[in-house]
């Protein structure tokens, strides 16, 4: 009799499990309005040091940037920051190789940033100051400017390559730099001076020299890291050659994130909404056969289309373009950030502009929307599953940010046993670099591990850094903008669903 009852109970359990296995559960989520730090996005902290007077980074100070919301410099608004912009001014090395001492100090900086849980936006330049001596330039910036010749720049990039490769995990993006004052590729002694002091245009030979520098920088980085150029025309001239026209085609979705040179070039605009063309950002600087001339509308269209698939950031530089650079309805600050897919801006400059966003009421939104901001809406999961069998699910999200993540990132569905805490991870196929602004419908089917034991499992989402050195550090994982989902200790996002797992005999 007991044996008969036992068999009945087993049959009952199997039937119930099979019913559960066929059921799908819908979970709905509540959006959070909180401002919180996330990797590789937001307002950055500016920092610079000269090779001739190297000031190293401070770990505790960097940790404070990430963990404590605070105001910086003349800013009226407080921020969390996971990004450090670091200027390395190679003032001692304009005509000679980088020293072993400088390279060691640079490597030490990388270690400090990694230990503090931040990432870096890096630019190298040779000169960050100007001289005026009555020259022709309307801005009063006069030659000699003080940057380095091509042979020296290429030598320095080769010296930097081992460190850039070694520390790519904490490099969010590298800016082209090197050429001209501030590394902005305009006022230069050696790469074609397009100002009134020079030819008033950039000749074909100078475009080729600039392209050689950009190519060397791309080669100095791993294929999974990108270089930002100062103007969209710089990318056109690199991709299509010195004679490229301003109506050259932007990158397509099919080419995006395929590790080619074209797919690894983004933009930094250091005069965001400073004028109708952002002080020459959207300009045609000419060639040997064409003059320098305005190209605002054409270059804006190119920038908007191409920037969907790469890193965009920069800073404001002048408040002369008010009210256009203000909050809506008088201005179009957020509209422009969305159209051009901004992931980051400078909190240190220019706060004459930035503070207006704070006083007018749109800074709170900008802080949350720079880069990505993923919000769970609802999800559909099986009530039960079996070891080794397919596990199909769907998740509906929204990206409320201006852009998608620009560096590759792992996505994991985590199953955590509710009793033992043991973790099983399902690597997912989705690429969140294509999770653009707006609604996202994500559907996948993954096989449950053969080794997963029967029991109840909590489901969680994890978006860890792709580098093993950072993948288990929660400060480098993406937090979703929902109430009651984030686990600060693990970097996981709770999906608020328990799934029953059976074995192959159930």
What residues fall within each predicted segment?
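Aromatic-lined substrate-binding rim segments of carbohydrate-active enzymes
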Residues: 65-131, 136, 152-153, 221, ...
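Boundary/entry segment of secreted carbohydrate-active catalytic domains
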Residues: 23-83, 87
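An active-site-proximal structural segment forming one wall of the substrate-binding cleft
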Residues: 102-119, 142-173, 206-220
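Catalytic cores of secreted or luminal carbohydrate-active enzymes
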Residues: 327-381
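Bacterial Sec-dependent N-terminal signal peptides
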Residues: 1-23
